[in-house]
Amino acid sequence: MCIRDRLYVYQRKDIDGSPWVRVGAATDGRSDGWLPAAQVSDWKQSLVLKFTERSGRAPVMFLRQSAEVEKLLADPAAAKNVLAKAQKNREDNQQVLALEPTASAVPQNQFYLLPIFDSKESFDENGQPVQLLNVASIDPGSAAAKPATKAIAADAFRTAVVLVVDTTVSMQPYIDQVRDVVHELQTRIAERGELDSVSFGLVGFRNSIKKTPGLEYVAKTLISLDQGRDPQRFLDMARQVKASTVSSHSFNEDAFAGVMQAVDGMDWSGYGGRIILLVTDAGALRKNDPFAATQMNEAEVRQAALGKQIKIYALHLRTDAGKKTHAGAETQYRVLTADANPQIGDLYTSVPGGDVHKLGERVDEIGTVFANLVHQVRSDTPQPVPLLSSAPSLADKSAAVGYAMHMDFLGRKTASQAPQLVSAWTADRDLTNPALPAFQVCVMLTKLQLNDLQQSLKLIVDAARKTQTSPKDFFQEIASASAYMSRDPQALRKGGNLADGGLLGEYLEGLPYRSKSLNMTQDLWLSLSVAEQEDFIDELDSKIRLYETFHNDVANWVRFGDAEPGDALYRVPLSTLP
């Protein structure tokens, strides 16, 4: 039996000595009928797994017993042998029940159901903790097949590179350098006859025009990807880009507005490789800055980009003028460009002294890797699995990122699906190299639940802002507002935490993550400094914005059976919960 639906249980009873359950696809109590209890599996926490990108890890193996997984964890060399044997003879399922596709990846934007029904902790050969996971039937569900997108229909792997460049007062030499480097790259690409496979775009960003109207724009698409396919057109349009003649109100600029303009404002369809290169000499305005246009923090901006399979690089110009901001900006941009593969770490690179030519070299280095990847794919050159050293170069990291993007593209092109299986054990790490994560853990939320979570966070944020001058009234304010949302205000008044009051939804209870929000109590709130309280609220506010991007991510919402629109499901990364 394969899981075809996610069902809610409304009643259980014994019929002729056998347990049966009354189930329905919707949350409104409507029943679709009865099923033998033996044909369903209890799935209490709605936890699901998503395969991580294939930027160096081996395909995931699904085994019969947890003990077999544990044995391979302790011996990666043996795991490599078992994997090689399984790849050679896929019919032999004595030990390996199923295998993730080898020649391509299961696409990041394809919906498949990989629920966790049980888990236990184990350790790898170095004593590092690893989760052993019992997963049941994997199935893309009953959703109708989606029409092929341009990216799937196209035979060729194409790459889009969008430069998001700070265009404030000091930046003209860097704007000119980026323009010239892109022109040189396009000249080389043209010589290979591959201009249709690599396109460049340009976004400029500045700072608040409310505070400084003379800046003209906060973020703006200066050259679209369609325009940027033509080298002469890119060159002519880039020559028109001028740095502002007006100074911003702060040294930090609105880099996140620039990145989000690229994420949401560019047409990325038709491109398997999707890259943003952020170029700036300043830190970014964060959520807690009243003049920040996005009202998002770096982790949320990164997640919004990943939702569209876009990778962000940060090229940080460490000029003398920005010395005081260097450390803070580096921290921001390392979070913004963080990669799930710990061998990659992040895609941050500093340009010492703000050297114009060094910036050009870095842009050329990254652009060349992706241009070469396109060339290799077009000439059918086999792609070796990336093997990253302990201190990989920018080019090595880029090659691994490009490899993962090409694997994802191949998965979409060949309609690769997650393997079908009834029940199996695996690990949350690559069995052949446990340093690499194999999965991202998500929680399945309905559209109604996500909306409820967002409204609850808004209630908490509003309550905190109303009581800034009298923090002891914070929980009283939440308790009063909770009554309007049919929650339990008495639980909050009795010294309970936000979970006790039911404010953040029972669907968050019991999840395997540490939640600052769920565990917040009146005493803990009062023990925080003003700055810590502000950080807490800013993070919640930033998540509210992120949930809006999830809500608008139409392609990745799925409905089963006759479920209502409000019961559509989305895989929300556990790391993005409050």
Where are these regions (language model features)?
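Von Willebrand factor
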Residues: D155-L277, A284, L315, R318, G322-K323
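Solvent-exposed loop/turn segments at secondary-structure junctions
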Residues: L7, I15, D28-G29, S41-D42, ...
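Extracytoplasmic/secreted cell-surface and envelope-processing proteins
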Residues: G17-P19, S31-G33, W43-Q45, M171-Y174, ...
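P/S/T/G-enriched low-complexity
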Residues: Q303-L306, I310, L317-P578
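Loop/turn elements at helix/coil->beta-strand transitions in domains of secreted/extracellular proteins
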Residues: T159, L195-G201, A243, W268-I276, ...
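SH3/SH3-like beta-barrel superfamily modules
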Residues: R4-A38, A84-S122
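Acidic, polar low-complexity linker/tail segments
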Residues: V106-V162, T168-D176, R188-E191
